[in-house]
Structure formats: C-alpha cells, structure tokens
C-alpha cells in the first residue's frame, strides 16, 4: 500500500515537473499572445469609443498647457544639499541676490558731444524711475566722495550738476572723470578705450519672475531703441538677467520651429517611402496628438520649459513615426497576402504590438535613467520624455488600426513600395555581405574601433553658462563686447568671514583683501574686482581732497582719521552696504568672468585658492569662492559624472531586459556589441571634431543607445522565430530575418536620422550638437545592426544557436507561426 502511494506521489510530481518544463512557456505564450489577441478584438470592436476617449483626453491635456511657463532662472544642476549650493545660499543670505545687474554701454566718440552726452545722462535718469529697478549707477547720477571738514565726515556730491553746452565742457569733464576717479575705472568707464557704462540693478524680488521679462521687452528695450534712433548710436546691453530673458525667448521660438520642421521632414520621408496620402495623414494625426499630450504633461506636472524639455515635443514626433512605419508596413504586408481588412488589422495588433511595446520600453528606459541623476533639470526631462514615449506607443496602437478599420483597403499602387527593386537590391546586398564578406565586416569594425579609441583620447571636458547660446544673436555679440571692454558678465563672488564684528575694517584684513584683489586683477579672464579695500582707498583719496595719487590703503595713523570720518558719515551716504554687511563681519569681493570653459575655470579657482590659503589663515577667516559661474562649474562636473552613471545604468537595464526576453547570456553580449560600437564611434568623432563632453553632448549616448537597441530587438525576435521554424538552421534563419526586418529597420533608421538632423539648424550649440551626434550614432547603429549583428550570429552559430544556450524566451515577442 505504501509502495503504491509512493509510486503515485512520484508519478504526480513527475507529471508536475513535465508540465513545468513543457507547458509553462506555452502557458506563458498563451497568456501574452492571447492578451494581444484580446486587445486587437477590443480595438476593432470599439473603434469609435477609443477615438472619442482619446479625443477627450487630448482636450483635457490640452487644457493643461495654460500652466506651461518658461524658466526665468538658470538651471541649477546641483542637488539642493550639495556643498556648493549651501555656500551660495549662505552668500545670498548675507548679501542678497547677486545676479541683478543689467549693463548698458556705448563705445562711440560721437557720444562725447553736448546733445548726445546729455541724452545719455538723461537715459539713466529715465530708467531709474521704473519700480523694477532698485538703483542705478551712471555718469549722469554719479556722486563723488568729498571731505566735510566742518562736520568731520564724508558726503556725496553730484559729479554732474548741469547739462553740457559745449564740446570743451565735455572734454574737460571727461578728462576729470578718467584721470581723477580710478575707483570707477572698469566699473563705469574704460579709460583706455573711452567706453562708458551704466549699471542698472534690478529689484531682486522680480529678477527671477515673469515681471523681469515684461520689463525688458515692454519697457527697457523700447527706450533703448528710441535712444539709438534719436542719437544714431549703438547701445550694447548685457548682464545675466538680460541674457537669460533673451535666451528664453529664443528657446520658445525654436521649440515651435522644431515641432513644425520635425513634422514636415518625417512626414515627407514617410510619404517618399509609402507613397500614400492616407498613411501619411494618419501618421501625422498620431504624432500631432502625441505633441499635444507632451505639452499637456509638461503643464500637468507644472514643469517649466527649459532647453531640454523644449526638445520633448519634436522628439515625440521623431520617435512616434517609426512606430507608425512598423504598424502600417505590417498592415500593408498582410493586405497584400490575403486582402482581408479585419484579419489584417487583427494580425497587425497581435503580431506587431508586443515587439513595438518592447522597443518603446527600451527607448523609454534610455530616457528614464536621467531620473537617477539627482539633477532637477534632468529628472524632469527623463520623467516627461519616458512618459510620452510610452504614450505615443499607446496612441499608435490604438489610433492607426481604429482609423484603418473605417477606411477602404489600400490600393495596389500603395503596396508597390513593398517590392521596390532598389530596396530588394539593398537587402540582397546586405545578405551577400553577411554571407560572403564576414572578414571584411570584422576588419572594418576593428579599424573603426581603433580610429575611434584614438579620437576618444582627444576629448576634453568643458562647458560654460553661455557656451551653447546662439552665437549669431545680437545679445551674444554684446556679451563678447562686455568681455573685451569690462572683463565679462558672469559673476564670481568671494565671501570673507572675519569671525569678528567689524573685523573687515581692520587694516590687516584690508591688506589681505588687497593682495587677493591684486591677484584677481592679474587674471586676464576676470574683470577688476569690486571690494571694500578699493572703497577705503577711495575714501583716503577723498580725505586728501580727491588727489588720485592717494588712491591707496591708509597707513595705521591715517586709518584712525579715516575711521573717525567714516563713523560720522550719515547713513544715507553709506557706500559700504553692498560690499560689507551691517555688522562689519562679512565682506564680499565681486568680479566678473569671461566665457571660459570649465577646464580653465578650474585653473582660475586653483590660482585664487592658493592666494586665499596663503593670506587668510583658516583659524581666523573663512573664505568661500561662490557665485553663479562657480555653481555652474560644479554643476557641469557633477552632471557629467551622473550622466556617465546614467549611461551605465541604461546599458545594464537594457541588458537585463534583453536577458529576460531571450534567456541567453551570450545573446546579451552579441546584442550589445553592435549597439556599443556606434557610441564609441560618436565619442571618437567628438574628439576629432573638437566637440567637448558637456551636459548637452553627453545626453547623446543614453538617448541613442535606448533608440538603437530597438532594431536589435526586432531583428533578434525575428531571428528567434526563424530558428524555431527552420529547425535551428542558423544561416537560413539569419538570412530570412534580415530580409524580413531589413526594410523596416532601414525605413525607421532613415526617419530617425533625418528627424534628429533637424536639430542641427538650432542656434543653440548644445541642441545642434545633440541632433548631429544622435543622427550619426543612429546611422552607424543601423549599419551595425544590419551587417555586424547577423555576421556575429553566423560566426558564433555553434555557441549560441542551440537549444541549451538559446532557450525559449521568457516573453514571446513575435508569434511562433506567422501564418497562423
């Protein structure tokens, strides 16, 4: 009896084991394939409901676009708790917002004529009336520091008290200003070039708001333009608030242009391939809805439009069209086979749906890895891009079959592209190359690898706040003007904590600050510093009746006289408030930096830090280098490191995904090689062409890898299917897979190539590089997937094309039998 029970139990477990081995994957296949069969039936029975639902969602998401706004601040690439951000916040807490300066300058001898010079002085007074301007410093409202012997204090006396009537008066005033006020040299004028400048300090409450934009476009620019017309003089305008405003306006203008161009280019290429207005219209409808959804999601999440999120709508067009190509191409193939519309649409959804889902997941994964970078800018880009990539897949699989179900069958002329002679010749050429020229393929690949590696060693890491801005725009030319005349517009701040009340005004501290400002003045890429020591030197000059030879730090004895005068000076005359805090403990040194790369910026920082370490012992002082220029430097380096991690994560995630789909470790390596090679080629090209690694260019690798691996999935899925159908005959399977998928892979790659190539017309350097590099990468990826991948499969057939190594996949991407 016990033996019978034992026998029955063993038999039961053996049956269960057999079921697991033989039938689990079949059950898995039934579940997934039946899922797509059910989806296809649902779509074809509820077309009107689906289209109406999509219409309602589109209207709802469209209503969210009212919440879209453009970024009015520089992108902070660092996490909030990063030490550099904490240092910058500490500086702002002591001295307030630093990026409020807008500067106007004129370099024209014609300015120094009575009428025009008076108008220039009046211009500053007219602008200062606006509530958006906190205060201004100009020749017209300049006050000279004077000694008041009677009250033993300093007072401010207007330098210009009347209008000028003759050229002689102006010449005398100019000589007096340039020769006797060294404190204002390179602040309000450049003595060498005779350039004069007006500094407008915006109210820090509006500098990061829409009010700033409205003020610049509606008030400041019209007044400046009128002055230029009336006086026939060019006024140069700059400063970070002004530059950011015009830059945002350019982003806004280009976003609309790219959406239109991407639609036109992809639709044009699509029509060239399919020769069907109906198919082109349906594709345009799908991607247009996708664009509305993209804008809607940006508004729904309350994200701002940045240089990256502005790329998402055209990106959705470029990625959405290949989805349509696969679906419509398969539909037309089915129609050509049997001419049954319903059967064709059902097969399209059930056969292409799963493969298209997988490819969109890998593309979305490439973008989703940006979420792990700890950068708000990239987090938002990654979230919105990955959501919308999956959304465009859903729209494609729902809208295209639904619309075709209402339309008549394609005409014979619309199916002729399936048998184009040139396309057949191209595919046959690829088959011949893979069959007969494997050595040539491997030799070419090896040569490309060697050349690319040499190029990689030429790559430099760089980046600056204005490097990627449109160089053909007037505001960029004005940036270069101010760099040449006044040393730059990007603020670099040094915060000095003396750790004692009134420690700043100690003579020993002033001498240390003097040494540091002298070091700054010797660096060609920095403007002369504005600091407390220069103001004290100006006070000494004023004490000696304005004699410029006394523009120097006081002696110990002179310091006592000066301090007595400074203490008696009325608060309204206090000229220290912007460079020394109210307690006298903190001082700031402000300088402005030219548009130098991060590599040069690091050397400048090292040079300054060496002086700081020498002059300011840490037990008595805490000196911090900060400012927007330095925060950007740290942000760039931080972002590049995070994007390298992001790329590694994208490769790992997609590798795991491929392993899960195909259940073969060797297949993972085979599939990665043709997709990593194009990345290496792109990196090599960057080295040879002098394109640096920076946030805008390193994005290329994660994006391109996520897209290029789609072709690999399509090819390997078809190859896996052919292996089963041809009883593990590798050569037959490879050739059949190449013939079957080659056309669609070629079509989609060409659309992607030209779609991304649209971005090279951008006036932004980063966007231009992004478009060009992704296009090149995807072109190499197409060649690699169509030649190198099949060649590898043929060469490694004994190692990977067997039932033990190449197991049945966890997910049946394509149906086992095409004709079922």
Short names for language-model regions:
Residues 28-70, 402, 416-465, 477, ...:
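Signature of alpha-helical transmembrane segments and their immediate interfacial
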Residues 89, 118, 164-277, 511-514, ...:
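Extracytoplasmic
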Residues 252-305, 372-376, 645-690, 761-764:
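Interfacial segments of transmembrane alpha-helices in multi-pass membrane proteins
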Residues 255, 284, 323, 336-373, ...:
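Pore- and gate-forming transmembrane helices of large, multi-pass membrane proteins
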Residues 269, 357-400, 404, 655-659, ...:
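Hydrophobic, glycine/alanine-rich multi-pass transmembrane helices and their short helix-loop junctions
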Residues 280-327, 667-716, 757, 784-787, ...:
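Hydrophobic transmembrane alpha-helices and their membrane-interface caps
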Residues 294, 298-411:
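Hydrophobic alpha-helical segments
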Residues 433, 437-558:
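Juxtamembrane segments of multi-pass membrane proteins
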């Amino acid at each position: 009896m016990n033996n019978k029970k034992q026998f029955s139990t063993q038999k039961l477990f053996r049956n269960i084991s057999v079921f697991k081995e033989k039938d689990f994957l079949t059950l898995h296949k039934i579940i997934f394939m039946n899922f797509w069969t059910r989806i296809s039936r649902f779509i074809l029975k509820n077309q009107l409901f689906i289209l109406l639902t999509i219409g309602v969602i589109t209207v709802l998401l469209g209503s969210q676009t009212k919440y879209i706004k453009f970024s009015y601040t520089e992108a902070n690439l660092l996490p909030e708790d990063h030490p550099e951000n904490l240092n910058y916040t500490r500086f702002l807490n002591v001295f307030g917002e630093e990026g409020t300066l807008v500067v106007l300058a004129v370099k024209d001898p014609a300015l120094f004529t009575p009428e025009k010079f008076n108008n220039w002085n009046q211009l500053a007074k007219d602008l200062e009336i606006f509530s958006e301007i906190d205060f201004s410093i100009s020749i017209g409202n300049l006050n000279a520091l004077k000694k008041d012997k009677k009250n033993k204090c300093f007072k401010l006396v207007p330098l210009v008290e009347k209008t000028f009537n003759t050229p002689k008066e102006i010449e005398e005033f100019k000589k007096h200003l340039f020769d006797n006020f060294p404190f204002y040299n390179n602040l309000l004028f450049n003595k060498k070039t005779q350039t004069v400048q007006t500094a407008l300090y915006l109210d820090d409450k509006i500098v990061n708001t829409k009010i700033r934009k409205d003020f610049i476009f509606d008030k400041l620019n019209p007044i400046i333009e009128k002055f230029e017309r009336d006086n026939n003089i060019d006024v140069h305008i700059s400063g970070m608030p002004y530059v950011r405003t015009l830059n945002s306006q350019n982003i806004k203008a280009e976003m609309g242009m790219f959406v239109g161009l991407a639609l036109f280019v992809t639709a044009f290429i699509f029509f060239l391939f399919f020769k069907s207005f109906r198919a082109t219209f349906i594709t345009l409808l799908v991607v247009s809805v996708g664009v509305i959804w993209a804008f809607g999601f940006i508004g729904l999440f309350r994200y701002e439009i940045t240089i990256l999120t502005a790329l998402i709508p055209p990106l959705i067009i470029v990625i959405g069209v290949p989805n349509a190509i696969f679906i419509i191409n398969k539909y037309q193939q089915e129609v050509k086979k049997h001419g049954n519309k319903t059967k064709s649409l059902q097969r399209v959804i059930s056969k292409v749906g799963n493969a298209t889902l997988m490819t969109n997941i890998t593309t979305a994964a490439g973008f989703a890895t940006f979420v792990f970078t700890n950068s708000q800018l990239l987090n938002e880009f990654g979230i919105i891009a990955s959501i919308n990539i999956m959304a465009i897949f859903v729209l494609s699989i729902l809208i295209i079959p639904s619309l075709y179900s209402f339309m008549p069958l394609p005409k014979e002329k619309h199916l002729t592209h399936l048998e184009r002679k040139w396309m057949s010749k191209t595919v046959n050429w690829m088959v011949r190359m893979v069959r007969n020229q494997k050595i040539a393929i491997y030799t070419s690949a090896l040569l490309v690898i060697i050349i690319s590696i040499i190029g990689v060693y030429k790559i430099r890491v760089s980046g600056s706040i204005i490097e990627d801005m449109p160089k053909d725009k007037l505001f960029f030319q004005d940036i270069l003007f101010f760099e040449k005349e006044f040393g730059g517009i990007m603020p670099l701040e040094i915060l000095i904590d003396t750790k004692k009340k009134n420690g700043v005004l100690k003579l020993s501290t002033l001498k240390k600050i003097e040494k540091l400002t002298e070091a700054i003045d010797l660096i060609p890429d920095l403007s002369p510093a504005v600091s407390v020591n220069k103001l004290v030197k100006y006070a000494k000059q004023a004490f000696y009746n304005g004699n410029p030879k006394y523009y120097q730090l006081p002696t110990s004895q002179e310091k006592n006289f000066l301090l007595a005068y400074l203490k008696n000076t009325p608060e309204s005359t206090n000229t220290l408030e912007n460079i020394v805090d109210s307690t006298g403990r903190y001082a700031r040194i402000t300088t402005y930096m030219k548009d130098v790369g991060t590599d040069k910026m690091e050397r400048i920082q090292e040079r300054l830090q060496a002086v700081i370490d020498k002059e300011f012992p840490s037990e008595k002082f805490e000196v911090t280098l900060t400012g927007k220029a330095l925060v950007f430097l740290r942000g760039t380096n931080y972002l590049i490191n995070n994007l390298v991690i992001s790329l590694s994560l994208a490769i790992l995630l997609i590798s795991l995904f491929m392993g899960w789909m195909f259940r073969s470790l060797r297949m993972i390596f085979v599939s990665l090689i043709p997709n990593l090679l194009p990345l290496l080629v792109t990196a090599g090209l960057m080295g040879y062409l002098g394109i640096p690694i920076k946030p805008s260019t390193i994005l290329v690798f994660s994006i391109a890898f996520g897209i290029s691996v789609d072709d690999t999935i399509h090819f390997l899925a078809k190859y896996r299917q052919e292996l089963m159908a041809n009883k593990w005959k590798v050569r037959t399977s490879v050739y059949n897979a190449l013939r079957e998928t080659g056309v669609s892979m070629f079509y989609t790659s060409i659309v992607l190539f030209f779609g991304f190539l649209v971005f090279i017309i951008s006036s932004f350097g980063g966007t231009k590089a992004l478009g060009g590099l992704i296009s090149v990468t995807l072109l190499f990826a197409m060649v690699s997937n169509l030649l190198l991948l099949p060649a590898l499969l043929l060469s490694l057939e004994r190692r990977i094309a067997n039932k033990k190594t190449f197991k049945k996949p966890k997910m049946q991407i394509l149906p086992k039998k095409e004709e079922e």
